[in-house]
From Swiss-Prot:
It catalyses: di-trans,octa-cis-undecaprenyl diphospho-N-acetyl-alpha-D-muramoyl-L-alanyl-D-glutamyl-meso-2,6-diaminopimeloyl-D-alanyl-D-alanine + UDP-N-acetyl-alpha-D-glucosamine = di-trans,octa-cis-undecaprenyl diphospho-[N-acetyl-alpha-D-glucosaminyl-(1->4)]-N-acetyl-alpha-D-muramoyl-L-alanyl-D-glutamyl-meso-2,6-diaminopimeloyl-D-alanyl-D-alanine + UDP + H(+). Belongs to the glycosyltransferase 28 family. MurG subfamily. Pathway: Cell wall biogenesis; peptidoglycan biosynthesis. It is found in: Cell inner membrane. It comes from Bartonella henselae (strain ATCC 49882 / DSM 28221 / CCUG 30454 / Houston 1). The gene is murG. NCBIfam families: murG. Transmembrane segments: none annotated. Coiled coil: none annotated. Its main location: membrane. PANTHER family: GLYCOSYLTRANSFERASE, UDP-N-ACETYLGLUCOSAMINE--N-ACETYLMURAMYL-(PENTAPEPTIDE) PYROPHOSPHORYL-UNDECAPRENOL N-ACETYLGLUCOSAMINE TRANSFERASE 1. Pfam families: Glyco_tran_28_C, Glyco_transf_28. Keywords: Cell cycle, Cell division, Cell inner membrane, Cell membrane, Cell shape, Cell wall biogenesis/degradation, Glycosyltransferase, Membrane, Peptidoglycan synthesis, Transferase. This is UDP-N-acetylglucosamine--N-acetylmuramyl-(pentapeptide) pyrophosphoryl-undecaprenol N-acetylglucosamine transferase.
Amino acid sequence: MTDKKVIVLAAGGTGGHLFPAEAVAVELRQRGYDVHLVTDERAQRFVRCFDEEHIHIISSATFTRRHPFSLIKTFWMLLKGMGQSLALFYKLCPVLVGGFGGYPTFPPLIVAAFMRRVTFIHEQNAVMGRANRVLAVFVSAIAGGLLSQNNRYAHKTVLTGNPVRDVVLNAAEIPYYPSEGEKPFHFLIFGGSQGASFFSRIVPEAIALLDDNIRQRLRIVQQVRGDTEELIKIYRQMDVQAEVAPFFDDMAERMARSQFILSRAGASSVCEIAVIGRPALLIPYPHALDHDQAANAALLARVGGAQIISEKDLNAQRLASLLTEAFCAPHLLEKQALAAKKVGQPYATRRLADMAEALIVGRSLSDVKEEFFDENAA
């Protein structure tokens, strides 16, 4: 057993929940804490920054509206997870327990709150997820990635931002260059794991409607899901320069090189666009729970850093018109890029760690908020 103070971080077993937890864990370890992860069995293929001794798999389940038997099973799994969490906390004696979303955070955070441990949750989106909505009542603090501080828990909400990768921070150093004259116009399209197929259909249809001189300047980079060969063939027939792939290792760099981005509005996408500072057309995924993507996009649009169009209102003609407008107004895109960058939160990982340490030593959240506000204003 180590003499270091123990912090337990809980996260759902998907990359979206685990990445911010891992980023904060690395930062807290550098500050001398012994950090453990509580998650579910899905996490094995995503976890990168924890060794086996520091990963604790607990029972959990997602609430559904299906058969009553499913509800009984869910309650049983959550109760089992609470028992496992209780045993773990008696063993580790954590000074802080933090949650990063997903139902596996529910048992440990509830148990920690009733044990009167210091607790926090991190909400990536502008709208709280279902597990976090319940946990918000019990925890000591709420760290907001995109969540407004003007919510019903404003007294304990601190705007920290969402942790972004180091490659994103490096890309943020690259200034935005408008495409003027006959310079190439770099157009980046990505849809994340949800709804990329919509872009695979509508983007080439829109490109076909553009004037020849615009198509000649276009340099397309498009992330797709399963339509790669067909899309490459379509762009080749139109004589449009395009790179099409299911995944790009250097996505942050490609974002930085782009003049315009077409994207969904997941929390990580919106935050990376803002930190790097690029103009974007955001199409919220219409089937997202709680319509969180629409709320995420609205935050960037409100400051003039992006445009929003719902999927049902976007067709090939509309997209072609918007692309033509973007070509003809390079300095307007430059203004959008600057507006987006002003609301980016590049120091989110450090701020989350700062907030965690403040909670451990009993500092008031109002002091933490004031400190972060002064940093933003500087």
